[in-house]
């Protein structure tokens, strides 16, 4: 018997509910009018979908709906299974299968290959218990637990129990849940408004036979989702159609107002059985729905559930049959006493009468058992009624599911949602056609959702055990993560120690004593005061591209014109003479372009290679880096080499005034706009700082008055072992794998070249412990420098949906869950926070030194900053500033981001030098 589903319907068209080929459609006007009520158009389904989605979003926001709505209850289940969960768990299932209670012993092995079937036993709940006092019900449950365990050698071990309680509850924790209202025929007094977990614990204690700890309260819908077999796509929706109906799904926690959280996901139980909207559901309600509702235990409540749930489908069929019989259409108008009795047609009867394999034979048998004498045409019409009622139920269920899928697609901002839906309940088990119609209707209503439906494996048993196991796994993984990241959480005391150590190293370095800080004089003796004027040239050499700049300093403005020139490999690795001749050629070309030929402008040279300065215009190249290896340069004064190249190029006059490193250039660039800027800070690929020191404190330069800019070279701070207590196993791994083990230890804990590597080593460690990526070791994480520091900035800049985290890690070939994404974010935050705090401790040491040098109670000072990590990371600058405020409360520090420190800064160093020279002449 092939069902014609809703595929291909146009707006306003109705889905066919023909039971099977060969069965005549009802021809009488009464039966047609009767069954026409159960037909639903696509437009009506779309209206239900939209209305339910609106109710869901209102409930998530905590807004009251004008009509009875869905509840959207957080279940505090925060993760779906990984497949590695293991252990023994006890499960108590109440309310999932009508008037019965089930106890299970579930063993999870952590592997698909070695699966242990759960042991279970079902207990029938007497009707007087279902309608009696609440304590009586929970005492009955405790007795059933004891009776079940009596059959097994449990001894006196503590047992972990998951409680599957399939009624609307308000959960405030995984093991705290208050019953909102009874459904499914239960009406035990004294339970609504009470914590059912505590009621069960009290009953178990009264029983006193076994030590049982109730650790999780789960409804059958959540258990269905959690009990789903792991497939190729995440199972993040659970759908139950049993005696009642409900759905749950994994929602972004930030959207659940009741949680007040902004990270991760949580499973939300929709409780859609209570959904009702007159505009959406009113047009599809029949007279039979109204009659069923009036006769129910809960008139006016659970209206949506009463159109779908298995507890009601048989009763709807009975009401239709009674109506047709009373009008003489069926059974010659003779209704038996049984047919007139509420509840005589059950879900199983409807399923059997729909079964295509038995034809109408089983219909005859069931009707005869009800005291009826059906003709062949009666059996066919009864079968048609069953199909009409169940088809509508499947279509309404599909409209509700489509609303959930739309919600998921929207909240995840995905063009096409790929998701698995776990299905459970006897309606799915007994009605194969129900699932087919559901699938077809979902495809029609949610065309951009690629959905696979997976039957849940004992959601009430294994699924509830899985919730308990997942909670245990998350708790264990959380402990490991916190232990791993604990060394990165610097205390105020630790930061104060770093500040003091930095201060001590500064003093020793200035006095020429052994120190990890070089404290090199730069021969820059003043910062800009705003009176600088004129045109200056600047050169910027630090890589394969070389810049020549014209910097015009006027009152209140600095204009920059620059030209980029490439340095061919043959020049970078050839003779030094040819390299500097090429540089001069570029300068001459720039002068021609700017109409400066023949002019001798003061020139500042930013030379970003290791140098020892002997004067403002003297710098000895210690060694080439960054792919340069020009011969005859190391150990030579690079300003002299430049001047010699100028001399060789006749008719060119250039006045080389200063050689500058990028840190000093940064300070000077900001100093023009803010005269209080007396410190420069670089936090990029590397890190360094400079500041204006009292000349009397600089042992290597004669003089007792005035200032001197000191290049700290603070990346080497801690090379004497002073940072050993802060160094982690991951820092050690990064250091040992570097090209300079044991060197630049401070830089390796702060700068952009190394933070990504620290994160990579932490991720490897957590993966090896099974905390990340399900413990699956991947080759990509083994590769050095695969995790770029820019990833930290992108990950920590991410929106709350963690899309960037997923994209970055998936591009690296890693398969991750939502939990993995959150943990990677936490790792990045811990590493970058420590880096910023260490940097802040260094800045605090410097500004405190400046304050005490001048004998001030309070100091107001600015710091010029440059570097990609500082500028691009979303939180680094704020963390540095906050740390300085804590460690140097007597200093008011303003951080200024530098603009072109290597160009503008070099020109301003030159401008200040010219100003000082002119003042000296005067």
From Swiss-Prot:
Residues 529-660 are annotated as: Hexokinase small subdomain 2. One of its GO terms (molecular function) is hexokinase activity. GO terms for cellular component: mitochondrion. Residues 219-458 are annotated as: Hexokinase large subdomain 1. Residues 82-218 are annotated as: Hexokinase small subdomain 1. ATP 1 binds at residues 93-100, 436-437. D-glucose 1 binds at residues 166, 183-184, 219-220, 246, 271, 302-305. D-glucose 6-phosphate 1 binds at residues 93-102, 220, 243, 424-426. The keyword Zinc-finger does not apply. D-glucose 6-phosphate 2 binds at residues 540-544, 662, 685, 866-868, 902. It catalyses: a D-hexose + ATP = a D-hexose 6-phosphate + ADP + H(+); D-fructose + ATP = D-fructose 6-phosphate + ADP + H(+); D-glucose + ATP = D-glucose 6-phosphate + ADP + H(+). ATP 2 binds at residues 540-545, 685, 752-753, 789-793, 868-872. D-glucose 2 binds at residues 608-609, 625-626, 661-662, 687-688, 713, 747. InterPro entries: ATPase_NBD, Hexokinase, Hexokinase_BS, Hexokinase_C, Hexokinase_N. Belongs to the hexokinase family. This is Hexokinase-3. The gene is Hk3.
């Amino acid at each position: 018997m092939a069902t014609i589903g809703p595929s291909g319907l146009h707006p306003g068209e109705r889905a066919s509910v023909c039971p099977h080929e060969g069965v005549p459609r009802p021809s009488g006007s009464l039966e047609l009018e009767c069954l026409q009520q159960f037909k639903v158009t696509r437009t009506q389904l779309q209206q239900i979908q939209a209305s339910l989605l609106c109710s869901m979003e209102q409930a998530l926001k905590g807004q009251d709906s004008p009509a009875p709505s869905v509840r959207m209850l957080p279940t505090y289940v925060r993760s779906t299974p990984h497949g590695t969960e293991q252990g023994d768990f006890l499960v108590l299932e109440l309310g999932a299968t009508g008037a019965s209670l089930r106890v299970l012993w579930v063993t999870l092995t952590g592997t698909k290959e070695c699966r242990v079937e759960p042991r279970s036993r079902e207990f029938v709940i007497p009707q007087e218990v279902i309608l009696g006092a609440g304590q009586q019900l929970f005492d009955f449950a405790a007795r059933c637990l004891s009776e079940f365990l009596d059959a097994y050698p449990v001894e006196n071990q503590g047992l972990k129990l998951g409680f599957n309680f399939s009624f609307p509850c308000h959960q405030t924790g995984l093991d705290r849940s208050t019953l909102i209202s009874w459904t499914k025929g239960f009406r035990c007094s004294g339970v609504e408004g009470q914590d059912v977990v505590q009621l069960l614990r009290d009953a178990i204690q009264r029983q006193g036979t076994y030590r049982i700890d109730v650790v999780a309260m789960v409804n059958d819908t959540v258990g269905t989702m959690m009990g789903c077999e792991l497939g190729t796509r995440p199972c993040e929706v659970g759908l139950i159609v049993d005696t009642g109906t409900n759905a749950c799904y994994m929602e972004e926690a930030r959207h659940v107002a009741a949680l007040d959280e902004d990270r991760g996901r949580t499973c939300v139980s929709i409780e859609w059985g209570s959904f009702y909207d007159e505009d959406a559901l009113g047009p599809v309600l029949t007279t039979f729905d109204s009659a069923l509702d009036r006769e129910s235990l809960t008139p006016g409540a659970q209206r949506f559930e009463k159109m779908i749930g298995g507890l009601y489908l048989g009763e709807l069929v009975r009401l239709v049959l009674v109506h047709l019989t009373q009008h003489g259409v069926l059974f010659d108008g003779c209704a038996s006493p049984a047919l007139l009795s509420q509840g005589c047609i059950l879900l199983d009867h409807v399923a059997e009468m729909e079964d295509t394999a038995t034809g109408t034979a089983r219909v005859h048998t069931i009707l005869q058992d009800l005291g009826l004498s059906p003709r062949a045409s009666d059996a066919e019409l009864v079968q048609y009624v069953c199909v009409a009622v169940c088809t509508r139920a499947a279509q309404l269920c599909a409209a509700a599911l489509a609303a959930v899928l739309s919600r998921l697609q929207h909240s995840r901002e995905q063009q096409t949602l790929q998701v698995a839906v776990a299905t459970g309940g006897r309606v799915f088990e007994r009605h194969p056609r129900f699932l087919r119609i559901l699938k077809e209707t979902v495809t029609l209503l949610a065309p951009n959702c690629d959905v696979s439906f997976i039957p849940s494996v004992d959601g009430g048993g294994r699924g509830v055990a899985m919730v308990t196991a997942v909670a245990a796994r998350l708790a264990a993984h959380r402990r490991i993560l916190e232990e791993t990241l604990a060394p990165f959480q610097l205390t105020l005391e630790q930061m104060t120690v770093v500040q003091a150590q930095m201060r001590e190293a500064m003093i020793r370095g200035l006095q020429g004593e052994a120190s990890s800080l070089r404290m090199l004089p730069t021969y820059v003796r003043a910062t800009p005061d705003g009176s600088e004027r004129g045109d200056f040239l600047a050169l910027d050499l630090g890589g394969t591209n070389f810049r020549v700049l014209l910097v015009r300093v006027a009152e209140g403005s600095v204009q920059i014109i620059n030209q980029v020139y490439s340095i061919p490999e043959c020049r970078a690795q050839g003779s030094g003479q040819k390299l500097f001749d090429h540089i001069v050629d570029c300068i001459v070309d720039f002068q021609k372009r700017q109409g400066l030929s023949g002019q001798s402008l003061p020139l500042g040279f930013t030379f970003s290679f290791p140098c020892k300065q002997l004067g403002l215009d003297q710098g000895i190249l210690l060694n080439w880096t960054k792919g340069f290896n020009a011969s005859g340069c190391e150990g030579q004064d690079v300003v002299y080499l430049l001047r010699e190249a100028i001399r060789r190029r006749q008719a060119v006059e250039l006045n080389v005034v200063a050689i500058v490193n990028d840190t000093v250039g940064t300070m000077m660039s900001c100093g023009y706009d803010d005269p209080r800027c007396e410190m420069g800070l670089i936090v990029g690929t590397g890190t360094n700082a400079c500041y204006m020191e009292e000349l009397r404190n600089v042992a290597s330069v004669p003089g007792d008055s005035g200032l001197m800019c000191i290049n700290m070279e603070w990346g080497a701070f801690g090379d004497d072992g002073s940072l050993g207590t802060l160094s982690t196993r991951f820092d050690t791994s990064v250091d040992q794998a570097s090209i300079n083990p044991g060197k630049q230890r401070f830089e390796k804990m702060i700068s952009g070249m190394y933070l990504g590597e620290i994160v990579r080593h932490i991720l490897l460690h957590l993966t090896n412990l099974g905390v990340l990526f399900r413990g699956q070791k991947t080759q990509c994480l083994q590769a050095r420098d695969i995790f770029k520091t820019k990833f930290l900035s992108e990950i920590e800049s991410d929106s709350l949906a963690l899309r960037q985290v997923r994209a970055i890690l998936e591009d690296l070939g890693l398969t991750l869950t939502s939990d993995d994404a959150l943990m990677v974010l936490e790792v990045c935050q811990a590493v970058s926070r420590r880096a910023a705090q260490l940097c802040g401790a260094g800045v605090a040491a410097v500004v405190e030194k400046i304050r005490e040098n001048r004998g001030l109670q309070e100091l107001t000072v600015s710091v010029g900053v440059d570097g990609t990590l500082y500028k691009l990371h979303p939180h680094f600058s704020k963390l540095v500033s906050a740390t300085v405020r804590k460690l140097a409360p007597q200093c008011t520090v303003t951080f200024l981001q530098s603009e072109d420190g290597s160009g503008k800064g070099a020109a301003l160093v030159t401008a200040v030098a010219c100003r000082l020279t002119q003042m000296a002449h005067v």
